[in-house]
Amino acid sequence: METIHATTILSVRKNGKIAVGGDGQVSMGNTVMKHTAKKVRRLYNGKVIAGFAGSAADAFTLFELFEKKLIEHGGSVSRAAVELAREWRMDRMLRRLEALLIVCDANESFLISGTGDVISPDDGVLAIGSGGNFALSAARALVENTDLDPKEIITKAMNITADICIYTNHNLVIEEL
């Protein structure tokens, strides 16, 4: 089976607000399979936003596991992120999962990987996926040089990314806290 490429997920934290956005394209090889995938969702009674890049089945498994970790740790995103990364890296079955996650609550944002990375950004901006570097660059420029709020920054940065990255489209889903 061909590798499924897809997605740009971007989170922006600015002036006490947080937003996470993702595009809707799913591609297999050089074929666009879906235009309206939802790769950003709310967890933990709407208090946490999570987005994924990579295999959808793997990501949903990780979303479920992350939400269990949130419940176990009383909603602490940092503790749940570290515990998920630890389990993901050490468990033989989970190690095979191919996805990256961005998770955010009102106070913290993290990128979580299967190699054990739990990264909190210095500047409030995180991006993953095939268009991640384009989105990260555009968002950082907009954060530093405009008065736009996080949702507006994500919209502009993701549209720039969709114009450049063939695996990213303009069908955006953006969640805010």
From Swiss-Prot:
* Top-rank lineage group of the source organism: Bacteria
Record CDD domains:
protease_HslV (cd01913)
Q: Which GO terms describe its biological process?
A: proteolysis involved in protein catabolic process
Q: Which Pfam families does this UniProt record tie to the protein? A: Proteasome
Locate the active site. Answer: T7
Listed under catalytic activity are: ATP-dependent cleavage of peptide bonds with broad specificity
Summarize the activity regulation. Allosterically activated by HslU binding.
Q: Which UniProt keywords apply?
A: Allosteric enzyme, Cytoplasm, Hydrolase, Metal-binding, Protease, Sodium, Stress response, Threonine protease
The protein's enzyme class: hydrolase
Q: Which InterPro entries match?
A: ATP-dep_Prtase_HsIV_su (IPR022281), Ntn_hydrolases_N (IPR029055), Proteasome_sua/b (IPR001353), Proteasome_suB-type (IPR023333)
Key word Iron-sulfur present: no
Where is this chain's protein located in or outside the cell? Answer: Cytoplasm
Q: Which GO terms describe its molecular function?
A: metal ion binding; threonine-type endopeptidase activity
Q: What is its EC number?
A: 3.4.25.2
What are its GO cellular component terms? HslUV protease complex; proteasome core complex
Residues noted as binding Na(+) in the record, renumbered to the chain: A162, C165, T168
**Record HAMAP family:** HslV
Per the record, the similarity remark reads:
Belongs to the peptidase T1B family. HslV subfamily.
Q: Briefly, what is this protein's role?
A: Protease subunit of a proteasome-like degradation complex believed to be a general protein degrading machinery.
Quaternary structure, per UniProt, is:
A double ring-shaped homohexamer of HslV is capped on each side by a ring-shaped HslU homohexamer. The assembly of the HslU/HslV complex is dependent on binding of ATP.
Q: List the protein's name.
A: ATP-dependent protease subunit HslV
Q: Which organism is it from?
A: Leptospira biflexa serovar Patoc (strain Patoc 1 / ATCC 23582 / Paris)
